[in-house]
Amino acid sequence: AASNNTGFGNEVFDDLTSGDANTGVGSQALAKLTTGGDNTAVGQNALDALTTADYNTAVGANAGGALTTGAANTAVGNDALETATTGAANTAIGAYALRVNTADNNTAVGNQAMIANTTGANNVAVGTFATDANTTGSENTSMGHASLSSNTTADANTSVGFTSMLANTTGAYNVAVGHNSLKANTTAANNTAVGASALEANTTGADNVAIGKFALTANTTGNT
């Protein structure tokens, strides 16, 4: 039998059979949970679809609402991880963060951070709209408003700074540190830009190294 559960709200724990140490607060929070344990859901429809998974935390209306069997996820914010179904060990903090995610080990902090991510794994995005177009790209790190915001399928980019790598879509293995660094880069790979506006205009030029404020800022397609 279920034990040590705390529930308050319409349909909370309606299907619970043997799950322990769960907390559900809000209409339909943890409504379909059967055997999962150590879950916390606060908000209307929070973790509504969860059935057997453990160690999930969802705070906010619809947070983690579609999650069924994914474990060890944290969703804080309205619609955070809202339609995610099976992903595990994800952290989404901010409205709509990781909203459609199904992959594992992603961290998104900020309004709409990684909102479009589906199967991309092992990403870190911090900042409003950070990596928000990413769908399948993995092992990317972005920090700053709209950093890597156009990235869709590229892997292994590191982008730190306001609008750094803003336009990048499929370029991989780039490093951009600084305000507007590699801002216009779209498909080029293996660039390193350190400094405000370093390689800012670069679009398709690959294998460049630019260190310092405005370093190679006008370079577009060349390799230096």
Specify the residue positions occupied by each region the protein language model found.
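Glycine- and small/polar-enriched repetitive beta-structure motifs of secreted/surface proteins
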Residues: A1-T224
